[in-house]
Each structure stands twice: as structure tokens, then as C-alpha cells.
Amino acid sequence: MPNAAWRLIWALNTIKDENDRITIDHFYDDIIPPDQEEMDFLEQMNYDGQSVLKANGIDHFINNLSGTALKEKLLYEPTANIAGIESGYTGKGSKTVIPSYAFCKIDFRLVKGQDAERVVKLLREHLDRRGFTDIEVIKYSGKNPYHADTK
């Protein structure tokens, strides 16, 4: 009997690499990079990364980013996040079970140029091409990115 938890983990593992880059084909194609005005804004923007690290009990950001590069990642790069995952027996004690289902909630933070409907389609195609046609994708909500004026 297949283990649904492992199946889901293997599928999720294809979505993002160890450098935090989303690996879905064509995911980055429509992104409009920050212009010079936006980059100038990042340079001047006050962001206390050390306080964020301390508040979260960690000693560095992903890829050891800091300064303008960190602010650019926070504001102008999309993300893929696993918000929650559930499978099998998680009660007290132990049981030898092979999970028949696995469920996770993932979310994508999109940036200027990206379209929520297109990203869902790209995710489905990505999973299908890698043999994960059995993984169901349910869209609960989706919003296109909002771009605020830096002035």
C-alpha cells in the first residue's frame, strides 16, 4: 500500500529548492522586476532585520541575506510556503500505520506581474509532468498582487 505522507512530501519537494527558489516551470516568467525608483526606495527603507531575527529565535535569514538584498527578497520576490501539513496517526503513543491520506496547505505570495489563476495552472502542470497526477490541487482563494506606489 502506498504511503500518502511520503507521496505528498515527494511532490512538495519538487516545488522549491534548497536555495529557496521556486522550481515550478515558468513561475518567474511574468514577474516585473523593481525599477530604479523602487530600488532607491529599498536603499532608504528602514528595516530592522536583527530585531526580526531575535524575535523569531533565529540567527540568520535564508541564504544569509541582509541589507537591500533582504528587503528586495521580502518585497519583490514571490514565495512558496507550507502553511500546514497533516497525515497519519498523530495521537498519543505510537501506532504502526501507513497513512492513506495526506493533506497540506500551501500558499504563494505573488509579486508584480504574476497572476493567481496562472500560478495555480502552473502548479498543476508542474505536478503532472513529474508524475504526481494523483495529488489533488484545490484552490481555496487567490488574489493577484497589489503594487503600492513607493512615493
What do these predicted regions represent?
Residues 1-151:
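Metal-dependent amide/peptide-bond hydrolase catalytic core
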